[in-house]
Each structure stands twice: as C-alpha cells, then as structure tokens.
C-alpha cells in the first residue's frame, strides 16, 4: 500500500473518531444525540445509482417538450451528429426534430447538469471549509457580483456573450475584493471572510437595485429581472464552450482535495497533527469553489438553494465523509437541476424561472432544518 492510500485511510479513520468525539461531547453537555432514523448507502453503490439516474433523467429530458421526440429518433439523431451514423441511409426524422434536439435541448441539458453539479459541489465545499451547515455558494458574494455584472451589461445593451463574460468577471472580482477586505477584519480568517462577504454582497446588491431603478422599464428592466431569477432558456453551445474549462478547473481540484476536506472539518489542530496545512487547503478549496460558482451563475443567472439543499440531502444518503459526499453531491445536483428545468420548460409556454422552483423546494427544507426536526450535521 503506497503512502497516498495510507494517508486517505488515516483521514477517514480520524474523521470517524472526530464524529465519535462530537457525539460524546453532546452527551456530556446534556444534548440528546439521536441515532439516524435511516440507513445510509455505501459510497460505490450510491455513485452507481446516481449515475444511472442521471442517464435516465437525461434521456427523459430529451423526449419532453412541446415538440415530441421518441427515444429511437433521439438516439438516431445523436448518433448521426456525434458519430456520423446513418449518413448513407435515408433519415427517418425531420430537420425540425434534429434542430430541436441538437441546437436547443442538448445544450440546455448539458448546461443544467453542469450548473447543478457546480453549485452542489461549491455548497458542500463551503460547508466543510467554514464548518457551517448553512453555508451556500453565495456566501462570499459570487452571486451578488455576477448579478451586478450581468445587470450592468444589460443596462449598457451588451450582447448575450458579453453579458455572460461580465457576470463571470464581476463574480471573480467580487470574491477577490472579499479576500482583500477580510485581511483587515479583526478575528479569525474564516470569520473575516464571512463578514466581508456579507458586506460586499450587500454593496453589490444595492448596485443592482440602483441599475434596476434607472433602467428602461419597457426593455432593460424586465431583462435584468428575468436574469436575476435564473433561467437556462437561452442555453447555447457558446455558453458551454465559455464555462466548461473554468468549471473543470474548479471541479477537479475539489474532487482531488475531498480527503483533505475531512481533515479540515476536524479543526486546524487536528489537521496540523496530521501534517496538513489547513490554511493552504482552505484557500485552494475556496478558490476552486468560487471558480465553479462564478462559472455557473454567469450562464444560468442566480439560482438559489441548490448548493444548500443538495449537500444536506446527500449527507443523509452517504454520510458526511467528503470521500463520497463530494462526487455524489455533484451527481445529485446535476439530476436535481435537470429535473427542475424539465418542469420549468414544460409547465407553461413561456417557462418558469428556475430560481422560483428551486426556492419552492429549498425553503421548506430550510424550515425543516431550523425547526430542529431535520438531522443536524
């Protein structure tokens, strides 16, 4: 067994010991520690199940819509476009059907999965780094910055691609400003980041409100409002090409650092005893989570609750170890947002903004947590 595997095993063992200590402290302090009322799945079976669900939901998403597409026709169109099949044979599908699948539904499905995976991964990462179960992807102001950038671009009458670019750039600049301000905040580094994030978010939200106030009420204001509610209705291949590399650049480090996240959740002293530089790992995780959040929000608008709700749901399924929690959260987030988007585009002709639908799910779950009837993490 090599050194890397030994390190991973020690991390998992230490994480279990830390959870036992936490339970013991709860008993000593008089708090009642109840055993989980459900049975958790092992990591590998859970991943297999969620991958299967993702494939099934993806195929289902292609067949749903005002222009019906059968599974046989769907597979034929994808095979023809991707692998060049059926080129020498007569098509049994129409050009309109091919355009609907390839130019409209496929970009939207891919973007739904990517955005859901990114928001869930970012939420799980922030909850571990800040050791706060209520942490979400917008804790450092990434969403507020992206909203201001998009509103400014719409106000200045920029094109679709430039709106996405402005939202992405402003999101990263906002978090950079939060890091800068946090250096001057008295207290710990984590507390400084959270307080600076609250202040900067409030500042950029005020800027967005001002732009809405002075925007043209007949043209610009509805466009800004709709963007801020979150939607994937205008998903294009250019959006995917723009965000796929930043998303991968953030998701891959989060997957590679998920064992170290277990160490960070034990506290800095435990991490130092195990030879882990908690400060550097924390910064690396925050930067990666911010990158995927900025990428997701820049193409989808502000979609709340996904990064808060999905990690908690996945903890009930696979436990709190980031070895399995991180990949399962990514899969669960992709499935969740994909199904919500299916509802969004099929309930009404115009489509319901995704942010509204995710709030209908997230708000009751949040209520369950704060009333103490849900499982505490």
Predicted features and spans:
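Alpha-helical transmembrane segments in inner-membrane proteins
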Residues: 2-377
């Amino acid at each position: 067994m090599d050194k890397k595997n030994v390190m991973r095993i020690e991390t998992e063992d230490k994480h279990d010991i830390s959870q036992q200590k936490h339970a013991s402290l709860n008993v000593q302090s008089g708090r009642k520690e109840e055993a989980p009322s459900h049975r958790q799945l092992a990591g590998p079976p859970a991943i297999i199940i969620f991958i299967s669900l993702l494939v099934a939901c993806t195929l289902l998403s292609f067949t749903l819509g005002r222009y019906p597409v059968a599974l046989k026709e769907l597979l034929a169109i994808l095979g023809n476009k991707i692998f060049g099949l059926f080129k020498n044979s007569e098509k049994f599908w129409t050009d309109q059907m091919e355009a609907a699948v390839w130019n409209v539904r496929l970009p939207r499905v891919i973007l739904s999965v990517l955005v859901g995976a990114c928001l869930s991964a970012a939420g799980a990462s922030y909850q571990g780094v800040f050791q706060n179960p209520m942490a979400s992807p917008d804790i450092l102001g990434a969403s507020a910055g992206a909203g201001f950038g998009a509103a400014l671009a719409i106000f200045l009458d920029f094109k679709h691609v430039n709106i996405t670019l402005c939202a992405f750039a402003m999101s990263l600049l906002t978090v950079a400003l939060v890091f800068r301000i946090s250096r001057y905040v008295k207290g710990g580094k984590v507390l400084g980041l959270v307080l600076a994030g609250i202040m900067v978010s409030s500042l950029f939200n005020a800027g967005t409100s001002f732009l809405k106030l002075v925007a043209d009420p007949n043209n610009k204001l509805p466009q800004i409002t709709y963007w801020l509610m979150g939607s994937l209705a205008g998903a294009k291949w250019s959006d995917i090409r723009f965000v796929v590399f930043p998303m991968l650049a953030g998701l891959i480090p989060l997957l590679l650092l998920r064992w170290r996240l277990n160490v960070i959740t034990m506290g800095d002293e435990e991490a130092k005893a195990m030879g882990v530089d908690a400060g550097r790992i924390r910064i690396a995780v925050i930067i990666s989570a911010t990158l995927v959040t900025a990428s997701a929000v820049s193409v989808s608008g502000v979609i709340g609750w996904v990064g808060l709700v999905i990690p908690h749901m996945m903890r009930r399924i696979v436990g709190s170890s980031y070895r399995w929690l991180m990949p399962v959260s990514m899969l669960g987030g992709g499935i969740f947002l994909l199904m919500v988007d299916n509802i969004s585009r099929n309930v009404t002709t115009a489509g319901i903004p995704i942010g509204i639908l995710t709030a209908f799910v997230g708000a009751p779950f949040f209520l369950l947590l704060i009333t103490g009837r849900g499982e505490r993490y």
